[in-house]
Regions:
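Short linear motifs at protein or domain termini
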Residues: 1-43, 151-169
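Hydrophobic packing residues in well-ordered alpha-helices of helical domains and bundles
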Residues: 26, 48-56, 68, 72, ...
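Hydrophobic, amphipathic alpha-helical faces that serve as interaction scaffolds
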Residues: 28-43, 73-112, 146-150
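Amphipathic alpha-helical dimerization/coiled-coil segments
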Residues: 34-70
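C-terminal all-alpha effector/ligand-binding and dimerization domain
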Residues: 52-58, 101-169
Length: 169
């Protein structure tokens, strides 16, 4: 099930509701994996494809949320590959379906789209310069910021849904 569906006795299964606390925990794991990957990639002075960042910035200017998510995933997956430790990518892959779902629910807001790619570019520069600790710190900050922003936006959306349907908290 991987947390995407839940049993609904007498009705089969339902799509599991989005959960802010679960999402924050997923981001904690992702942040740790990303920091390790960035350190290893920086040790190799990995230079990310500049076209990848350009495509991400372009997607951020549009309205296609799937393209935004795909660009973000491509950036992180490039770092996982550059780390040359297949366990990082395998471990991260377990969590990306949860992240895609949360990102898809909240990325309609344009406020943070450009800052995400500014952060990605700074991470890429640190890796290319061989600054492993800086790359890890930047990607950790990036993950924490993403968790905070997406968590706040998700909380707003969930609260809005509950109040519009008359549910109580």
């Amino acid at each position: 099930k991987d947390g995407l569906i839940q049993d609904a006795p007498g009705r089969g299964v339902l799509v599991a509701p989005l959960d802010v606390d679960w999402m924050r925990q997923v981001y904690q794991v992702r942040g740790a994996l990303d920091a390790l990957a960035a350190k290893l990639a920086a040790a190799r002075r990995f230079q990310i494809d500049s076209g990848l960042i350009a495509r991400g910035r372009e997607a951020a200017q549009g309205k296609d949320v799937k393209a935004m998510i795909d660009a973000d995933m491509a950036f992180h997956q490039a770092i996982y590959a550059a780390a040359q430790n297949p366990l990082i990518a395998q471990s991260a892959q377990l969590h990306w379906h949860h992240l895609r779902r949360v990102m898809g629910a909240v990325l309609q807001s344009t406020q943070q789209r450009n800052s995400i790619w500014d952060e990605h570019e700074a991470i890429a520069q640190a890796m290319a310069a061989g600054q492993a600790e800086r790359a890890a710190a930047l990607i950790d900050h990036h993950s924490q910021q993403a968790s905070n922003k997406l968590g706040a936006r998700l909380s707003e959306q969930l609260f809005s849904r509950k109040t519009s349907t008359g549910d109580t908290l």
